[in-house]
Amino acid sequence: SHSTTNKKEWKKNLLKQVLRPFSKVYATNYMCCSELAGRWLFGDKAYDSGQVYLLNNAIDLDKFKYNESLRKKKRKELGISDDTLVIGHIGRFVAQKNHTFLIDIFNEVHKKNNNSILLLAGQGPLKEEIENKIKELKLNDSVRFLGQRSDVNELYQAFDVFCLPSLYEGLPVVGVEAQASGILCILSNTMTKETKVLDITKFMSLNNTPEEWADSILDDVKRYKRIDTSKEMTSKNFNIKEEAKKLEKYYLNLYNNGGEEK
C-alpha cells in the first residue's frame, strides 16, 4: 500500500474507495510503506495485529549525505555565493504543492534577509501562474526555476532549508531525501507524522501566516549547524541497502514457509 486519500480530490477518492476492498480479495500478505497507508488500505485491526509488514520508503543514503565540497561546487555552478541563504523546493507545479503560499513565505524571508534565494525544481501546469506571481512581487532576481532535474541529490547540497507547504501529502520521498542531506526541513502539518524522521524537521500549520513561516525559517537556520545524518537515517530504517536485505529476508521467509509469515 502506498495509498491515502485527500478530500480535495473527490473523484480519485471515490475510485480508491471502490477499489480498496478488492486489494484484500486475493492478497495472501499485506505490505505498506507507512503506517498511514497501511491503516487506510488494510484497516486498523489488520495493522494492529501485525498482519501488515511495514517497509519504509528507503533511499540510497550515499547519494544524499552531506558533502561540503559538493555543496560549494554546486553553488558555484548555480552562481550562488557561500553566504547566501538558499531555500529549496522540489515538486511539480500543481495545486497540491501550494507554490503560491511558498512564494508568499519566501517574500517575507526576502524582506528580512535580501541575501536569500529560492530554488524551484520541477515542471507542471501551474508554472506560468507562479512565474506571474513572482513578477508581481518583484522577486524575479531572487527566485529561480530549475526545471526537471536529474541531479536532485546534488541540489539538496546547495540548499540551506527545504520548504514543503503542501496542501496534502502521504509520506513524501523528497522529505526523506532532504533529511538525508542534512538540511533543515519546514513542512506543512498536512502530511503523516512519519515524515519527520529526524529532529531537523519541523511541522507548521497552513493557518500560520507566511510571515510566521518565514520567522521560523530564519530563527532555525541561525541555530543550525549542518551535519552528516546518514548514520541516524540508517538507524531509522531509511537506508535502502539495509531495507533491501530485510525485504529479501521477508520474501525468503514466505517462500520457505509456504507463504505464511513466521
Model-derived features: positions:
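Membrane-interface segments of envelope glycosyltransferases acting on lipid-linked substrates or membrane lipids
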Residues: 1-262
